[in-house]
Amino acid sequence: SNRPMPLNRWQFKNMISCTVPSRSWWDFADYGCYCGRGGSGTPVDDLDRCCQVHDNCYNEAEKISGCNPRFRTYSYECTAGTLTCTGRNNACAASVCDCDRLAAICFAGAPYNDNNYNIDLQARCN
């Protein structure tokens, strides 16, 4: 689909660039069962598990009244590869920022397996 990217996705992409400067954010946009379009089945590896946790984190944030994680922008800083959610966020923004921050840190610590990029969701994620 060529819908415009939600602003929050743009911020998340920049967070990933902060913690994993060696890779394009695009490498994480269609990985395993949970990174990007998926959201079911058993995570294929640690990186995919990062995305499953991120999905669950967004689901928790949605419980905050009026909070839509996919469109909620937030205030954060990247300093030498370290992400900080700043104090200017309301409850929703703070939650979403932390979801994205923790995922970006998780991505940095997880091995990337090229075989798990753009997998067959039907076959592997039931």
From Swiss-Prot:
Instruction: Give the UniProt tissue specificity note.
Output: Expressed by the venom gland.
| SMART domains for this protein | PA2c
Give GO terms for biological process. arachidonate secretion; fatty acid biosynthetic process; lipid catabolic process; phospholipid metabolic process; positive regulation of fibroblast proliferation
Subcellular location field: Secreted
Tell me, what's a Pfam family for it?
A: Phospholip_A2_1
Q: Which reaction does it catalyse?
A: a 1,2-diacyl-sn-glycero-3-phosphocholine + H2O = a 1-acyl-sn-glycero-3-phosphocholine + a fatty acid + H(+)
Q: Which CDD domains match?
A: PLA2c
Q: Where does Ca(2+) bind?
A: 34, 36, 38, 55
| EC class of the enzyme, as a word | hydrolase
User: Which note does the record give on the cofactor?
Assistant: Binds 1 Ca(2+) ion.
Which cysteine residues pair off into disulfide bonds?
Answer: 18-78, 33-125, 35-51, 50-106, 57-99, 67-92, 85-97
Give the positions the UniProt entry annotates as the active site: 54, 100
What EC number(s) does the entry state?
A: 3.1.1.4
| UniProt main location, coarse | secreted
GO molecular function per UniProt: calcium ion binding; calcium-dependent phospholipase A2 activity; phospholipid binding; signaling receptor binding
Q: Which domain of life is it from?
A: Eukaryota
Provide the alphabetized UniProt keywords.
Calcium, Disulfide bond, Hydrolase, Lipid degradation, Lipid metabolism, Metal-binding, Secreted
Name the coenzymes or cofactors required. Answer: Ca(2+)
Regions crossing the membrane: none
Q: Does the keyword Protein biosynthesis apply?
A: no
- Propeptide positions, renumbered to this chain? 1-7
Q: Return the similarity comment.
A: Belongs to the phospholipase A2 family. Group I subfamily. D49 sub-subfamily.
Q: What does this protein do?
A: PLA2 catalyzes the calcium-dependent hydrolysis of the 2-acyl groups in 3-sn-phosphoglycerides.
Can you state the subunit structure given in the record?
Heterodimer formed between two homologous isoforms: isoform 1 and isoform 2.
This protein is called Acidic phospholipase A2 2
Species whose genome carries this gene: Naja sagittifera
